[in-house]
Amino acid sequence: MKLGIVGLPNVGKSTLFNAITNAGVPADNYAFCTIDPNVGVVSVPDERLDWLSQLHKPKKTTPAVIEFVDIAGLVKGASKGEGLGNKFLSNIRTTDAIVHVVRCFEDSNINHVEGSTVPLRDIDIINLELVMSDIEMVERRIDKAQKAMKGGDKKFAHEVEVFTELLEHLNKGKLARTFDVSEEDRALIATSDLLTLKKTIYVANMSENEVNEPESSRHYMAVKTLADSEGSQVIPICAKLEADIAELDDPEEKAMFMEELGVAESGLHKLIKASYTLLGLISFLTAGSDECRAWTIKKGTKAPQAAGKIHTDFERGFIRAEVIAFDDMKACGTMAAAKAKGLVRSEGKEYVMKDGDIVNFLFNV
């Protein structure tokens, strides 16, 4: 999974990126300190994987990972080349979802590119640049389809119709993900890789004083209302606090520090949970003496396709899957005990994978 972190300059974007990835990239108090997109890969914490590793003592343990891309601060006119321009809009296209950091704190010592803290205005500035970029993409798509029609290929008529309606929607400043369309046509639109079609998590970057009671902040509530209206998620985070937590290496010291501050879970954990929920993702596990590993798949994935995540041969030659739920495995203590109780199931090609399944795939090629 790849998440692109966007936002106006000086909203706490790079500070948050540093905190969740421990990458130590510049987070200076001026616009465009992020010259190129910084990339950090973080492990997805999973207590189930930890337990399996303690049981099997494997040669290696491989958690699921999330790739975070810190994309340079966008400004008005980015879609037309202002600031750092189109290059950085193109970096967003390669991501699975967008993490939009919004400044929801007041601090006269930290410059705001627009001069004041108004979260919805800031969101509109970013979204408008994404919309403008999408308009260009859709116009090119329509032009290409119309040329194909003139060449005698009538199957593009419906494509022209759908994208023309979408263009009207975008020209009103609306996001592609709010375009009301059938599932079939939405799948067609998805082939165009539009920025405003991507699912979005808004990160409300708040002060230390407000982050534990976000509902008391009018800035946060404004962002939450917007997120709810478009089916997005919003997470209250204090990037500065996350940076302080990230500097502590000792787990016990970190836990004590978080408890003192009343922080129940880290911003990274919040982001991971929100991204899995928003993108409809689950994890299954494989375990043995060589390796214990967590694999990320979409909800609704069937066993052969899940096997294909490990190796294409597993999917091509799929025979069956030996499956046990993690909770059953943990309750039994060992695989032998689980088999003795009949808790290990044999599942075929139509089996839909569940979160926490421990699986052994049988295949033949």
Q: How should each PLM-predicted stretch be described?
A:
Residues A23-A31, N38-G40, R48-W51, K80, ...:
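Glycine-rich, flexible loop/turn motifs
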